[in-house]
């Protein structure tokens, strides 16, 4: 499994590609940051983010894209830019038919460090250890992108099993629904509630 992790942002959009399967050693294929100038127009910045992500998709051909799920923050301007970059990342993947997964920061931290409250230094240290790197990737956005990819590789098998179980449950439930297409509805028993019968000229 080859996953492109994307830590969305307008000024710095972290990108990292990791290859491997759950339970086996993982390999970093590449890591970097797509940068845009804060002085540029918003539209131009989004185009730059799109082009940068497209370049990574062209070069590394990932089978999956993992993007950090955006949460509301006190700084509305920051969260808006992050959400816009996230949308661009998902669009780039969807346009190529690449499955996209969203992971919360706490999910990523828990998957990589064992604690959903780990700080960036701890995440960077564990990414370095798990991928057998000489030093933590810089800036932190790059390390976060690799952590996203690692998280998805480890969580994907469980998520797939859960989705399959839910789909199977829905299918079996639909086939047993009374009155469904091809399924006869319940028959009424004479004298049961909701029915009437005539007794000696009067209705019972």
Curated annotation (Swiss-Prot):
Q: How does it assemble?
A: Homodimer which binds Holliday junction (HJ) DNA. The HJ becomes 2-fold symmetrical on binding to RuvC with unstacked arms; it has a different conformation from HJ DNA in complex with RuvA. In the full resolvosome a probable DNA-RuvA(4)-RuvB(12)-RuvC(2) complex forms which resolves the HJ.
What is annotated as the active site? 7, 68, 141
Q: How is the cofactor bound?
A: Binds 2 Mg(2+) ion per subunit.
Similarity comment text for this entry:
Belongs to the RuvC family.
Which GO biological process categories is it annotated with? DNA recombination; DNA repair
A GO term, aspect molecular function: magnesium ion binding
**This protein is called what?**
Crossover junction endodeoxyribonuclease RuvC
For this protein, the Enzyme Commission number is 3.1.21.10
Q: Tell me which InterPro entries the record gives.
A: RNaseH-like_sf (IPR012337), RNaseH_sf (IPR036397), X-over_junc_endoDNase_Mg_BS (IPR020563), X-over_junc_endoDNase_RuvC (IPR002176)
Pfam families the record matches: RuvC
* A cellular component annotation (GO) from this entry: cytoplasm
* HAMAP family cross-referenced by the UniProt entry: RuvC (MF_00034)
Catalytic class of the enzyme: hydrolase
Residues annotated as binding Mg(2+) 2 are 68
Where does this protein come from, organism-wise?
Streptomyces griseus subsp. griseus (strain JCM 4626 / CBS 651.72 / NBRC 13350 / KCC S-0626 / ISP 5235)
Give residues annotated as binding Mg(2+) 1.
7, 141
Cofactor names = Mg(2+)
The record's annotation in NCBIfam families points to:
ruvC
Can the keyword Nucleotidyltransferase be found in this entry's annotation? no
Task: Fetch the SUPFAM superfamilies from UniProt.
Answer: Ribonuclease H-like
Record keywords, A-Z: Cytoplasm, DNA damage, DNA recombination, DNA repair, DNA-binding, Endonuclease, Hydrolase, Magnesium, Metal-binding, Nuclease
Region annotation Disordered: residue ranges?
164-204
Q: Where in the cell is it found?
A: Cytoplasm
């Amino acid at each position: 499994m080859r996953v492109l992790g994307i830590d969305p942002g307008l000024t710095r959009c972290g990108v990292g590609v990791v290859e491997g399967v759950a339970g086996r050693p993982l390999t970093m294929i590449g890591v970097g940051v797509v940068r845009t100038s804060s002085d540029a127009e918003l539209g131009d910045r989004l185009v730059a983010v799109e082009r940068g992500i497209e370049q990574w998709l062209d070069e590394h051909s990932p089978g999956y894209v993992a993007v950090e799920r955006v949460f509301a923050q006190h700084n509305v301007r920051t969260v808006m830019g992050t959400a816009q970059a996230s949308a661009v990342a998902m669009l780039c993947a969807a346009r190529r038919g690449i499955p996209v997964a969203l992971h919360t920061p706490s999910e990523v931290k828990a998957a990589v460090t064992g604690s959903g409250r780990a700080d960036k230094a701890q995440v960077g240290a564990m990414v370095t250890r798990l991928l057998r790197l000489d030093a933590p990737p810089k800036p932190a956005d790059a390390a976060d992108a690799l952590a996203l990819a690692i998280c998805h590789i480890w969580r994907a098998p469980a998520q797939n099993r859960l989705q399959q179980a839910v789909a199977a449950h829905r299918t079996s439930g639909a086939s047993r629904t009374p009155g469904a297409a091809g399924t006869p509805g319940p028959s009424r028993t004479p004298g049961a509630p909701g029915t009437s019968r005539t007794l000696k000229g009067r209705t019972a």
